[in-house]
Amino acid sequence: MVNIGFICEGYTELFILESNNFKALLNQLGLHSVGVINVQGNGNLLPHNIKSHRENLFKKGASVIFILTDLDQDQCITKTRLRITESENQIIIVAVKQIEAWFLSDNLAMNQIFQGDYSFEYPENEDIPFETI
């Protein structure tokens, strides 16, 4: 079992990363999450802000840390990765669209949440899917 840790920028990512289904997936892959830290906003993913979070996850036994963020208003994935800064034993995952766009595309989940007939034809075209939800 490989111990990993996560640093994310918001509650949506936190909800997914701490879900039982995600933990079961990690287990199937031979991975164990030692913790998820929500820095509450991508501006808090700057190196001086995440240093202590990385240290805490490593102290808990993580051998690799995954940082999850959205592209947001950045024009380029590379610029987003450079803003966060690459580090040893760290993987930066940049979602091109905000993760909330995935919810807009999941008709079954949205039907359960809103208890009705839900359909959203082009979630990938939403500039700010969180506000749409």
What are these regions (language model features)?
Residues 1-60:
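RecA-like P-loop NTPase motor core
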Residues 2, 61-64, 88-90:
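Short coil/turn segments at beta-strand junctions that form active-site/ligand-binding loops
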Residues 5-9, 62-74:
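Acidic beta-strand-to-loop metal/phosphate-binding motif
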Residues 15-18, 76-80:
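A short acidic (Asp/Glu
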Residues 43-47, 72-73, 83:
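A short linear-motif detector with a strong N-terminal bias
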Residues 50-69, 112-130:
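A broadly tuned preference for mixed-charge, low-complexity surface segments
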Residues 77-133:
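Activity-critical C-terminal alpha-helical subdomain
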